[in-house]
Amino acid sequence: MAHKILVVDDEADIVELLRYNLELDGHELFSAGSGVEALNQARKHLPDVILLDLMLPDMDGFSICEILRCQPSTANIPVIMLTAMAGEMPRLHGFEVGASDYCLKPIRTRDLRERVRSVIETCAAREAAVNAELVNAVSVDQRKS
């Protein structure tokens, strides 16, 4: 099943590498090269996953992730942060602001494709559990009536 993925990176080579590899998996890709463009694209397309570079020309990925988490329409979209910044602190800060996962550059495409697949499956399972709980709640209410 095709999923919509927003790739946010100001390096065209990285965007094209990700586009090629993720389209092999049948995904539909959109891209943005700045923070403002990323926020606009996220609101417009409501992607299933956002791949977000931390270092963009107008704002950092941490700030973008925080903004996404504060808006009802984008609050639950999984974000995988992409960065060359190794170390525990940037990774932990990413999780603090709401990132779902973290991938170091240079990007190993097979690894990233698996991370995307995993995040999508986790979201689908969570949504199925919520739907099952709602159906169960409705059934209980109907039995009480």
Show the residue positions of the predicted features.
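Charged docking surfaces used in two-component/phosphorelay signaling
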Residues: 16-24
